[in-house]
Every structure is written in structure tokens, then in C-alpha cells.
Amino acid sequence: MGKLTILVLVAAVLLSTQAMVQDQPADRNAVRRNDNPGGASRKSINVLHRNECPWQPWCG
């Protein structure tokens, strides 16, 4: 009887997690919007290139 109880509990947990994943409104086909084109890392790399960066591995 104990094994049946554990099996039922595991099934309930799996079903509830599957339902939570399906409830998320994210659309897989949606195009992501880039609010920060280039980003901070690209800006810092550009600054390093302009200043002739002495640290070759980090200059890109």
C-alpha cells in the first residue's frame, strides 16, 4: 500500500509541474526585442580597441 501512495504522489507532482509549464504565456515563435543593441560589453570592447588595449586576450 505504501508503494501505491508514493506512486500517486509522484504522478501528482509531475502533472502539476507540467501544468505550471504550460501556463506560461511566452510564445516560442515571438521575436525577441533587443532594448540594448550592442550592449555594455560591446561598448567597453570598442573603447578598448580605440585606446589600443594592452591586454590582448580581453581586447577581442
Curated annotation (Swiss-Prot):
Modified sites of kind D-tryptophan: 55, 58
Keywords, sorted A to Z: Amidation, D-amino acid, Disulfide bond, Ion channel impairing toxin, Neurotoxin, Secreted, Signal, Toxin
A UniProt-annotated Pfam family: Conotoxin
Disordered: annotated span: 25-45
Coiled coil ranges: none
Organism: Conus buxeus loroisii
Subcellular location: Secreted
Annotated disulfide bonds: 53-59
Function of the protein: Its target is unknown, but this toxin may modulate voltage-activated calcium channels (Cav) or calcium-dependent potassium channels (KCa).
Molecular function (Gene Ontology), one example: toxin activity
Prodomain residues: 20-50
Record comment regarding domains: The cysteine framework is C-C.
Comp. bias intervals (Basic and acidic residues): 25-35
Domain of life assignment: Eukaryota
Protein family membership: Belongs to the O2 superfamily. Contryphan family.
Protein name: Contryphan-Lo2
Expression by tissue: Expressed by the venom duct.
Entries under InterPro entries matching the protein: Conotoxin, Contryphan_CS
Residues carrying Cysteine amide: 59
Cellular component, GO, one term: extracellular region
Signal peptide (from-to): 1-19
